[in-house]
Amino acid sequence: MRRTFFKAKIHRATVTHADLEYEGSVSIDEDLLEAAGIWEYEAVHIWNITRGTRLQTYAIKGERGSGIICINGAAAHLNRPGDMVILATFAELEEAEARDFKPTVVLVDRQNKIVAKDAVEVPGPARRVTA
């Protein structure tokens, strides 16, 4: 039996742009995509910490090293520059794969620069990035 598991996330990223006129998707700095193991055109959940909204779209490559997180298309109504978001992906795994699987968690600062990458989530305020 296949089950759906949390695969990766870019945690507490800052939305840099919102482009209502673009066809759709979320543009993500290519450095962040690579760090999280998120592929271009992969389904991505966007959980807006600032506004409490949630949606699903797909990732496209943004300029490497730019820190860009641009919410495109209709999703721009739900996300604005300066909002803090979590970008997450999921994967379907067979039981044998899932036993040893560990998700990737990428923590970023307010400029969307990577400050940590690991596979362990620690709840609570001690883990939060405030830089």
UniProtKB/Swiss-Prot annotation:
Main location: cytoplasm
Catalytic activity: L-aspartate + H(+) = beta-alanine + CO2
Subcellular location: Cytoplasm
Entry's Gene Ontology BP terms: alanine biosynthetic process; pantothenate biosynthetic process
Residues with PTM Pyruvic acid (Ser): S25
Assembly mode: Heterooctamer of four alpha and four beta subunits.
PANTHER family (UniProt xref): ASPARTATE 1-DECARBOXYLASE
The protein's name in its UniProt record: Aspartate 1-decarboxylase
Species of the source: Anaeromyxobacter sp. (strain K)
Taxon lineage: Bacteria, Pseudomonadati, Myxococcota, Myxococcia, Myxococcales
